[in-house]
Each structure stands twice: as structure tokens, then as C-alpha cells.
């Protein structure tokens, strides 16, 4: 763990040096086991303990914002937020989706967004989703979330591969049309 802690401290230090004072540094915590396998969630108690540890490391590293990134289930998102709510860091959450209405776990996106109202979340994002799914989900975000939101979709065609290799890409025109749709508020 000491090597990981040292690497985190150095990474944040390098980011701050490169960014200067006007850019916020975001610390990211992904699902504890696998972004694309919600069934591997270790359970609430184990998750709260691990998220609290990771959040403490991010606080010590002095990141400005903490994002629970590529969250795939409501239970893991809630456990993470319970563990992080007292960090005094700005909190963001991003979700990977099964379709425009459901997280990868099958949990309803609107129910999950409603759960977020129990916490102080500055930003909700959709990430690691194909362009079409992202575009279709924008309306769900607009209808069910009144605070800040955004998207950063995958450019790869189809579902993410286990090895992370993207072999086919969407056109820049299609990407820009999804961005324009999101900017127009759905």
C-alpha cells in the first residue's frame, strides 16, 4: 500500500504543477472490483470501509474534487457516498449504463438519481457508454436531475472490451451531434 500511496501523492503533485492554480484536480475512485461487473460488488460494509480508506488517501493527496467514476450500481454508489460524505471534498458521480434507463446492474437510473438527493453532489455524469446510449440517456438526466450534469461517452462502437482495446470508432460527426444534443439540454 505504501507504494500506491506514494504514487498517488506524486501523481497529484505532478498534476498540480502542470495545471497551475486555476485548474481543479479531480481524484477518481472506480467501483471496487470491476466497472463492468456490478455482480462483484463486495457488499455495503466492505465497500464503506474501502471507500473511506480511498477517500482519506485522496484528502491527504489534496485533490480538489472527488469523483465516484463509472459507477455501475445504486448500492455501490450509495456505499461510496456514505463513506465519502464527510471528506469536505466536492463530490461528483458518473455512471455506466445498460440502457438509457438503467445502470449496468439493472438499477433504474431515475431511482439512483433520486437517491443522490440524500447527498451533496455537485455533478452527475454519464461515462463509458456508447454514443447512442449516452444520447438516449440525456433526457433521463434532464428529467430527473436539477443540478450540474455532463457526459463523456466512449467513441468505440459497441460495448467496451475486457482488454480495453477499441478497434472500431464512431465518426466525429456522430460524436459532435451527441455533444450538441446534450448542450441543448436534451
Indicate residue ranges for each PLM-predicted region:
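Domain-level signal for soluble alpha/beta catalytic cores
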Residues: 1-186
